[in-house]
């Protein structure tokens, strides 16, 4: 088959595009792949294409980047344009592999050793959104079978349910893994009977030494009958803490030590915080075993988990293989690093709270869902923030500013405006008669009306504004009046006749202010607390988001006749 002039031109344009893109002679292998991918009709004669490509590449290599670009613009200007288009990273949720509408079953499985964090919020949002996308079933499963290292908190169960309610998600099922010990025990017996599990009495350090050397422990070849006897003794509490471990028999010579005869059950004579469980059990399933059984029993079709849990999937794969089950389709995603919080864990946060470093799980300095809710972050903003991260193996590094930007879109149109003055300094205005200032509740939505502030001859302004004032300068008290500074210490001023238009043209300083008889305001935020004075009208905004002008958006958390407590959301 002889290549047509059009075929040769096609090869040339893709070779030129490669040269222009990388500013060097075209790479034959890459160009060949491109040509074959874009031109199915040429796949029948790869030899002729390869020969022609070799000649064309040799000729192009004699030129320079400017000549390549000129020639490419002559024969295929659209390819020049394609090189100039910056490809945006994919955002949002990609289709799930093998997902069928109405048949998808997914779960979010937290350990309730504390409330949901921004880390767990990703799983809460993405799993529930996929289920919604495919009209499937969503399971909230509490993986609460660790009585020791990650001991459950009773309050955390309700906190997760409350967070899901806030997100607008109603799980189709709520499951407590700690209710299913009898099921786990039954499957353990079956594995023992099959010769796929055994009771190991090695000390931890001894087993590790053997495992690392790819050597079987002395108990590995114990008969199923004897293993069943030891298993029943474990359940009866006849062995001491950590005296015996039930192990899944895998490949003791596997190249990955983490997959060699991994532990499935251990003895811990401890109580469970749930009253229904209490001291009922002394043999506790480890997470890889319990999770494998749960995912099968609950009919999971798809799992999304961190790439750090790839080994868990491999360990669980042995159980699925032994029972002839099909493992759910699994997607792994990378870690998320939020700049403002760095690395954190629920366990470390719990210790810090118990040590008194934080006021509680909703302390505004913490990366918990409870904390950001209290600050005024809206559920829809968090959902969009998490969805736009997408699902991929690449680690994600992101700033809270992205979440704040989404939240700002939601709260800015609805938040009433008020003045809050921190570190207040008294400003006396000579000749000012008592009056009532009328200020807009919202700068663009005038249907909201105005807020009225009774003003005498004194107001409060921020100390940081005072530091920037100069004697004789004319400034505007926002939405009120123009004044001229006559003294810096004490701070005094007089009314100015300079027009508002002239002040705007001169870009004069605009200062927000508060009445001297305003209400005491405490703002709690990620950077610490601020005290000051605000308008009395703030007391009518309990549990609402407001904007303290020139300060930021805040949620009004508590009010009394003497004081307002607000939580800072963001600028």
From Swiss-Prot:
SUPFAM superfamilies noted in UniProt: Nucleotidylyl transferase (SSF52374), Ribosomal protein L25-like (SSF50715)
What do the Gene Ontology cellular component annotations say?
cytosol
Q: Which UniProt keywords apply?
A: Aminoacyl-tRNA synthetase, ATP-binding, Cytoplasm, Ligase, Nucleotide-binding, Protein biosynthesis
* Catalytic activity annotation: tRNA(Glu) + L-glutamate + ATP = L-glutamyl-tRNA(Glu) + AMP + diphosphate
Q: Drop me one GO molecular function for this one.
A: glutamate-tRNA ligase activity
Q: Where the protein is mainly located, per its record?
A: cytoplasm
Q: Which Gene3D superfamilies match?
A: 2.40.240.100, HUPs, Ribosomal Protein L25, Chain P
Look up the domain of life of the source: Archaea
The GO annotation for biological process reads: glutamyl-tRNA aminoacylation
- Report the residue ranges where the short sequence motif 'HIGH' region is annotated in this entry: 110-120
- Enzyme Commission no: 6.1.1.17
Q: Where in the cell is it found?
A: Cytoplasm
So what family is this one in?
A: Belongs to the class-I aminoacyl-tRNA synthetase family. Glutamate--tRNA ligase type 2 subfamily.
Q: Which HAMAP family match?
A: Glu_tRNA_synth_type2 (MF_02076)
Q: What does this protein do?
A: Catalyzes the attachment of glutamate to tRNA(Glu) in a two-step reaction: glutamate is first activated by ATP to form Glu-AMP and then transferred to the acceptor end of tRNA(Glu).
Q: Which PANTHER family match?
A: GLUTAMATE--TRNA LIGASE, GLUTAMINE-TRNA LIGASE
UniProt name for this protein: Glutamate--tRNA ligase
Q: Which organism is it from?
A: Methanosarcina acetivorans (strain ATCC 35395 / DSM 2834 / JCM 12185 / C2A)
């Amino acid at each position: 088959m002889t290549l047509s002039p059009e075929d040769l031109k096609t090869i040339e344009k893709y070779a030129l595009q490669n040269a222009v893109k990388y500013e060097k002679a075209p790479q034959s292998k890459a160009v060949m792949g491109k040509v074959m991918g874009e031109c199915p009709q040429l796949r029948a004669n790869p030899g002729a294409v390869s020969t022609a490509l070799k000649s064309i590449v040799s000729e192009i290599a004699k030129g320079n980047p400017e000549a390549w670009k000129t020639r490419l613009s002559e024969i295929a200007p659209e390819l020049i344009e394609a090189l100039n288009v910056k490809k945006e990273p994919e955002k949002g949720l990609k289709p799930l592999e093998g997902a069928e509408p109405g048949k998808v079953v997914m779960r979010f499985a937290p350990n309730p050793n504390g409330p949901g964090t921004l880390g767990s919020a990703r799983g809460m949002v993405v799993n529930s959104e996929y289920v919604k996308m495919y009209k499937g079933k969503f399971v909230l499963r509490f993986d609460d079978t660790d009585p020791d290292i990650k001991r459950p908190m009773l309050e955390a169960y309700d906190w997760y349910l409350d967070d899901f309610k806030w997100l607008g998600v109603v799980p189709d099922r709520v499951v407590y893994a700690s209710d299913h010990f009898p099921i786990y025990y039954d499957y353990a017996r079956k594995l023992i009977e099959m010769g796929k599990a055994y009771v190991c009495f090695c000390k931890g350090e001894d087993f590790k030494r053997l495992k690392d050397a790819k050597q079987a422990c002395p108990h590995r070849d114990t008969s199923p009958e004897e293993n069943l006897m030891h298993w029943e003794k474990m359940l009866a509490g006849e062995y001491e803490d950590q005296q015996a471990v039930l192990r899944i028999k895998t490949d003791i010579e596997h190249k990955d030590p983490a997959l060699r005869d991994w532990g499935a059950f251990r003895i811990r004579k401890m109580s469970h915080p749930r009253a229904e469980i209490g001291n009922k059990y002394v043999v506790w399933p480890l997470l890889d075993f319990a999770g494998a059984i749960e995912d099968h029993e609950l009919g999971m079709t798809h799992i999304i988990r961190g790439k750090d849990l790839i080994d868990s999937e491999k360990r669980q794969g042995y159980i699925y293989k032994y029972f002839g089950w099909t493992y759910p389709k699994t997607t792994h995603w990378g870690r998320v690093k939020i700049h403002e919080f760095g690395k954190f864990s629920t366990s470390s946060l719990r210790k810090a709270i118990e040590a008194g470093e934080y006021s509680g799980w909703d302390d505004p300095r913490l990366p918990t869902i409870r904390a950001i809710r209290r600050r005024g972050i809206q559920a829809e903003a968090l959902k969009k923030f998490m969805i736009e991260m997408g699902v991929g193996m690449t680690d994600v590094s992101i700033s809270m500013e992205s979440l704040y930007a989404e939240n700002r879109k939601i709260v800015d149109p609805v938040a009433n405006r008020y003045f809050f003055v921190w570190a207040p300094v008294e400003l006396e205005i000579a000749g000012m008669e008592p009056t009532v200032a009328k200020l807009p509740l919202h700068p663009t939505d005038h249907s909201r009306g105005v807020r009225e502030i009774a003003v005498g001859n004194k107001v409060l302004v921020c100390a940081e504004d005072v530091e920037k004032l100069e004697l004789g300068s004319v400034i505007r008290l926002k939405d009120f009046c123009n004044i001229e500074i006559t003294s810096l210490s004490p701070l005094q001023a007089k009314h100015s006749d300079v027009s508002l238009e002239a002040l705007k043209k001169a870009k004069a300083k605009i200062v927000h202010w508060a009445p001297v008889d305003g209400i005491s305001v405490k703002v709690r935020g990620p950077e610490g607390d601020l005290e000051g004075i605000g308008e009395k009208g703030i007391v009518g905004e309990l549990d609402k988001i407001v904007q303290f002008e020139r300060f930021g958006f805040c949620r009004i958390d508590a009010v009394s006749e003497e004081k307002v407590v607000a939580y800072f959301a963001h600028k």
